[in-house]
């Protein structure tokens, strides 16, 4: 087996240089990095992980000990724990016990030889603290999860007694029904807390008639079937969601004539699930926070025990509140944009129909067709809800939409649920609430994380520009990095182009210009509320676009979907796209899957895209339309929508670990919305602003300047003339 000494001899460098290269340190010249990497590849060198740990004196390995990985709550926990650990440059080892004490003690005996730095354990041991201590594990190195071992140990979990009381109050109000409760024969602390709180909350007569079924994991099917021989209770309460799933299957197969309600704490379900009445606990969040807490304990060497209880999501309500009486319509007609967001509405609307009997019918039109229809209000008379692009809202709101507060004065209360920067930009004009955000999007910078972190490329960039290779904060940096990664300019680049541009249509060309303009100016209107494009900043924005020509694919992309597809093909180092098109980057066919970094756009003042849903003045069923809007645009439906289309509105949705794991750019999207400054005039000059017309003027001249038909100075003069002629 080749050694570092062999590599040093082959490459003609010192062993210290080899060590620096293999450990990813950036203090070696690009030429020596190339020599070492070539020699290592030629000799077939592989890193001896155990030897490296011994040299370092500590490892970057965390172990997770779980009962199993078949229960969905543990799968959610582990995936989230692993993701957080990897983001901090730690690896994870997974061990499963099947709740077998002997097996867990065998695992403990191996932990030191496996050289783990810390352990997160859902332990089945009654003497867990003592067992881990005997295994040479110090108190700050182990974090007990879900099942509390002792008040003298580090612990994180949920308030399981609170869940028990919640279901106990529900049962106490249910009347004289026979209740069943299913728990482990030797319940762990979480189940014990749930069961005690549940039974203490029941009425005396219910406690006397409570059917208690005790099971073990390995024999749960047999034990539940045996207990049901004496009759099936009308309502079941279970401390374990996995046992609830087992009970459901047994009832469906062996007692199809019975349909008892099944109530249980459960992991969080982003998509609707209708088999159980659930009290949801966010195990994905538990995984993240457990990893964070364990690493904090390791860093601080803290011996003072911490006991952390996370808040529960509780019962997330998917139901629709429909007033009693008749007069409800058979259907609601929606005018929507032909786009992926429509699939989410069509899918989730089926739940609304199941509960209310009201069908949701969708008419799909293009961006330009919807604008044309909005310009002719009589064409909207058959629609109850319409989709408006964010650039349409100011121009059309008070002409064609019904102010929502006229129908329901409390509607403004729902604005508090939206993430910062979304509510006002997608809902309001001139102090009135006209729409609810449904599909907001914002510009984000996507870059090849694998290239930006490549030791060789970082060193070459440092040598060439005397700067660190990192995501660009300014467009000057963006241009420099684009040049560096363009192979025609730098033969060492692994990709063909450093960046991309989307200029094929007027509206998208305007976005490319405005992103650069707004990086230097937050103001688009003067003190009198009139459009006032700064000539110098505008000229610089056009010059930046023109100067980027050698470093982008030609011809430039026509639409954002083309831009996303181009980046996912793997031949570009950076791209700026709207967040609603980022799904393309994580498709199975994407060549950049797992290699993507996301950041704020240069200048940190992105543009908005996407749109809202409002109720036209001619709607025949405005109250029912508003009821549907409130249901569709609020939690938990909002999170289900986001899981389907990658577009989030509510703050709770951005905090949803399921969605964060599916769409890794969500945190940057939320931050981007909070940075946006409005294109519309200041509120004191709140007159309708035809943003689409303005962007078309900008886009047309941007295209001409890029094609060389106008100089930047001529193009900006043309823009100012067109604005005066058409918009003043």
Specify the residue positions occupied by each region the protein language model found:
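N-terminal helix-turn-helix/winged-helix DNA-binding helices
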Residues: 1-2, 41-79, 88, 113
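N-terminal helix-turn-helix DNA-binding module of bacterial transcription factors
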Residues: 1-58
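Flexible loop/hinge segments that line or gate small-molecule binding clefts
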Residues: 122-166, 264-276
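Flexible loop/turn connectors
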Residues: 230-239, 245-323, 329
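Hinge/lid segment of periplasmic solute-binding proteins
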Residues: 390-444, 476, 595-599
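C-terminal capping/gating helix-and-loop segments adjacent to ligand/active sites or protein-protein/ligand interfaces
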Residues: 557, 654, 667-723, 727
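Extracytoplasmic/periplasmic substrate-recognition and gating elements
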Residues: 588-655, 678-687, 700, 713, ...
């Amino acid at each position: 087996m080749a050694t570092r000494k062999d590599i040093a001899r082959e490459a003609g460098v010192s062993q210290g240089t080899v060590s620096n290269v293999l450990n990813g340190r950036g203090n070696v010249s690009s030429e020596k990095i190339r020599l070492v990497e070539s020699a290592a590849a030629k000799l077939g060198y592989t890193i001896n992980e155990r030897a490296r740990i011994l040299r370092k004196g500590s490892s970057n390995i965390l172990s997770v000990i779980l009962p199993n990985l078949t229960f969905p709550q543990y799968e959610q926990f582990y995936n989230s724990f692993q993701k957080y650990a990897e983001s901090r440059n730690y690896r994870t080892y997974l061990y499963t016990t099947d709740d077998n004490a002997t097996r867990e003690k065998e695992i403990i005996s191996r932990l030191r030889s496996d050289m783990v730095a810390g352990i997160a354990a859902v332990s089945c041991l009654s003497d867990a603290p003592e067992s881990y201590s005997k295994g040479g594990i110090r108190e700050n190195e182990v974090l007990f999860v879900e099942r509390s071992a002792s008040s003298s140990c580090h612990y994180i979990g949920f308030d399981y007694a609170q869940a028990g009381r919640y279901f106990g109050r529900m049962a106490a109000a249910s009347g004289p029904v026979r209740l069943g409760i299913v728990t482990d024969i030797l319940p762990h602390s979480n189940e014990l807390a749930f069961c005690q709180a549940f039974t203490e909350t029941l009425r005396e007569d219910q406690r006397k008639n409570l059917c208690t079924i005790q099971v073990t994991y390995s024999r749960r099917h047999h034990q539940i079937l045996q207990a049901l021989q004496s009759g099936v209770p009308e309502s079941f309460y279970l401390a374990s969601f996995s046992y609830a799933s087992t009970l459901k299957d047994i009832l469906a197969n062996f007692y199809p004539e019975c349909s008892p309600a099944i109530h249980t704490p459960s992991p969080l379900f982003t998509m609707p699930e209708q088999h159980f009445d659930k009290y949801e606990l966010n195990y994905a969040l538990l995984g993240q926070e457990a990893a964070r807490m364990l690493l904090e304990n390791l860093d601080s060497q803290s011996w003072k025990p911490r006991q952390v209880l996370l808040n529960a999501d509780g019962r997330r309500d998917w139901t629709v509140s429909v007033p009693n009486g008749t007069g409800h319509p058979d259907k609601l007609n929606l005018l929507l944009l032909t786009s992926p967001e429509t699939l989410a509405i069509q899918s989730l609307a089926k739940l609304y129909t199941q509960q209310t009997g009201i069908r949701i019918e969708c008419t799909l039109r293009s961006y330009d067709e919807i604008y044309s229809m909005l310009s002719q209000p009589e064409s909207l008379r058959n629609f109850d809800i319409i989709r408006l692009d964010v650039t349409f809202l100011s121009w059309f709101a008070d002409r064609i939409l019904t102010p929502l507060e006229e129908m329901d004065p409390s509607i403004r209360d729902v604005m508090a649920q939206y993430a910062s920067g979304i509510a006002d930009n997608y809902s309001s004009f001139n102090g009135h609430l006209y729409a609810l955000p449904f599909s907001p999007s914002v510009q984000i910078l996507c870059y090849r994380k694998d290239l930006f972190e490549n030791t060789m490329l970082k060193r070459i960039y440092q040598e060439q520009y005397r700067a660190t290779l990192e995501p660009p904060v300014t467009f000057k940096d963006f241009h420099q990095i684009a040049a560096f990664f363009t192979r025609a300019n730098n033969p060492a680049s692994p990709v063909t182009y450093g960046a991309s541009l989307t200029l094929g249509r007027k509206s998208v060309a305007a976005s490319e210009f405005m992103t650069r303009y707004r990086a230097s100016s937050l103001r688009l209107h003067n003190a009198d509320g009139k459009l006032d494009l700064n000539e110098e900043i505008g000229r610089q924005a056009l010059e930046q676009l023109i100067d980027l020509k050698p470093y982008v694919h030609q011809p430039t992309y026509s639409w954002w979907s083309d831009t996303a597809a181009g980046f996912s093909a793997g031949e570009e180092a950076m791209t700026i796209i709207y967040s609603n098109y980022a799904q393309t980057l994580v498709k199975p066919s994407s060549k950049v899957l797992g290699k993507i970094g996301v950041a704020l756009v240069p200048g940190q003042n992105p543009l908005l895209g996407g749109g809202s849903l409002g109720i036209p003045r001619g709607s025949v069923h405005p109250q029912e339309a508003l009821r549907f809007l409130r249901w569709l645009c609020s939690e938990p439906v909002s999170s289900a929508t986001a899981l389907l289309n990658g577009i989030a509105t509510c703050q709770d949705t951005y905090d949803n670990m399921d969605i964060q794991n599916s769409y890794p750019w969500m945190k940057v999207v939320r931050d981007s919305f909070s940075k946006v400054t409005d294109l519309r005039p200041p509120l004191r000059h709140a007159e309708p602003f035809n943003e689409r017309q303005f962007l078309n003027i900008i886009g047309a001249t941007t295209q001409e300047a890029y094609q060389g038909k106008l100089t930047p100075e001529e193009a900006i003069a043309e823009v100012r003339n067109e604005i005066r002629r058409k918009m003043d």
